[in-house]
């Protein structure tokens, strides 16, 4: 798994595309550069997020 920050969520997967168009289209997931599973679609946090719907994400990091 690449060491990248995931800030995008499409189809239940996080993508490392940092607000580019692929974040909207889901291309970053389709072309194999997904790097994790979204625990919260609105928050787009990585697997370690335990804040639930009360968290906010900045560059892949959760903050309750």
From Swiss-Prot:
Pfam families: Metallothio_6
Coiled-coil spans in chain: none
Keywords: Metal-binding, Metal-thiolate cluster
Record SUPFAM superfamilies: Metallothionein
InterPro entries, alphabetized: Metalthion_4_echinoid/annelid (IPR017980), Metalthion_4_echinoidea (IPR001396), Metalthion_dom_sf (IPR017854)
Regulation: induction: By heavy metals.
MF annotations from Gene Ontology: metal ion binding
Transmembrane region(s): none
Function, in words: Metallothioneins have a high content of cysteine residues that bind various heavy metals.
Protein family according to the UniProt entry: Belongs to the metallothionein superfamily. Type 4 family.
Name of the protein this chain belongs to: Metallothionein-A
The species this protein was found in: Strongylocentrotus purpuratus
Taxonomic lineage: Eukaryota, Metazoa, Echinodermata, Eleutherozoa, Echinozoa
């Amino acid at each position: 798994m690449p060491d990248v920050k995931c800030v995008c969520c499409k189809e239940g997967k996080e993508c490392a595309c940092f607000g580019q168009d692929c974040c909207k289209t889901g291309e970053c997931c389709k072309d194999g550069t997904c790097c994790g599973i979204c625990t919260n679609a609105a928050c787009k946090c990585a697997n370690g997020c335990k804040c639930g719907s009360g968290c906010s994400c900045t560059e892949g990091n959760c903050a309750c």
